[in-house]
Amino acid sequence: MTHPNIILTGFMGTGKTSVGREVAGRLGRPFVDLDDLIVARAGKSIPAIFAQDGEPAFRALEAALCREMAEPTGIVLAVGGGAVVDPANRQALAAGGTLICLDATPEAILSRVGHDDNRPMLAAPDRLARIRELLDRRAAAYDAIPIHLDTTHLSLAAAAERVMALAAGLPEDGYYLPIRYEAPAGEVGRSSSADLLPASSGYAVLIAPGLLAEAGRRIAAAGIRPGRCAVVTNEVVERHHAETLRRSLADAGFEPVVFEIPDGEAYKTLDTAAGLYARFAAARLARGEPVIALGGGVIGDLAGFVAATWLRGVPFVQIPTSLLAMVDASVGGKVAVDLPAGKNLVGAFKQPAVVLIDPDLLRTLPGAEFRAGLAEIVKAGIIGDARLFEQLAAEGPASLTAMIADAVRVKARVVERDPFELGERAWLNLGHTFGHALELLSGYTLRHGEAVALGTIAAAELSAALGYCDPALPGRIRAALGRLGLPTSHTFDPQAALAAMGTDKKRRGRALRFILIRRIGEVTIAEDIEAGAILAALEKICKT
């Protein structure tokens, strides 16, 4: 099914071409610049058209091409700001998709195009005055376009993200973060005219307050046909959020069947999965009918594992309700259940059709669970966003939605490059080899985020001891985590923790793999580390 176009217009120098190319690249769509089409059709450059044929001839060519672009073909299109002065051109372009007007201050525009001689409309002694004159002349036409984005102070990446969010119909504080990957053989195909991504090439993480109430139409927009669907949740989340989801799904034509399971990591087992299979069979859930995970990391992992294996795979949707699940477990497609021998030992890669993150759901999250989620955000900063780490270390959480988006962005970049953990995706396991051992020893009374915090400190201590990083770095990381209310030491037996690491799934053969830190924002993979060094790192986080 053909996707609507994303059309960027606005005055010269506002970023139509550069932002358009970035958006097209992120979404895997063709990029078209209307000016390039004009040059190809005229057989001469734009300055030559103006000089030899005059502006009316240029505008006539422009109008003809706008009419041709009226059909939705799934392109990202950059259109000169002069084209949309004509209401007929605006109408034709908007018929093909979402028309967005990019804005910038006259001074910013001059700084971007002031030395470009390929701008016949700016042929004047005082270019700033000419820019202001043209902006005033076109103001009414630009104001007639409902969707605007000011790019004056935005980086290219930030502007592209905002364009994608606007094209997806998200609010001003919303984010649309696409994750593109090569679909493996047998992946359930999907296609939707409302989704921004081409079918079967990836999925999107949508982040915006109030998103749960829009879940039904967002799931349909991701290419899932309305009909019956399974909602897997637990008793706590069901009490707070299930009714809002039910209404949203019903409004979009879905028929939700809710399957409640007990709360807690202790229930992320093959027995619980088998119970869901039996209940799905009794409900006669068919292939193509999606499984929707409404809950934290346990629900997402378990529901995703069941979705990957029920009828050899059905569509899967993640709606995380804990901070930890929002910034980590819901993104990337890793799903699993635990065995008595260790965490996540039986699992699969199951990419979701869409991930819907509603920060408003965190209002019902207990404080300790919120703090546990902050550990994964600190981890994301250490792996790939020094600014995020420094902000958390110095100021603590700022804008919740933006902070979640920052952490998801780090993970999305890694997952796109390595969707099936053949290489650098292992970076995301920073602190987890230590942390999973601590969880296992605690009988899963230690929260995952708390274990990750302790494991990250241990990884930093190991990194410093082996000469990978500045000796002061473990102290900085310990202080940042402690400031956020996370544990920096724990009562356990270091020898038992070392033995428990032998069952960790991240080992290669008999060798344990550790993610070590070079500096904030850069990590590396190391193997064949002596047991004595690992034990010494564990002792650094052991409460005496």
Language model feature labels by segment:
Residues 390-496:
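Active-site segments that bind and position negatively charged phosphate/pyrophosphate groups
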Residues 375-378, 468-544:
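C-terminal charged capping/lid subdomain of soluble metabolic enzymes
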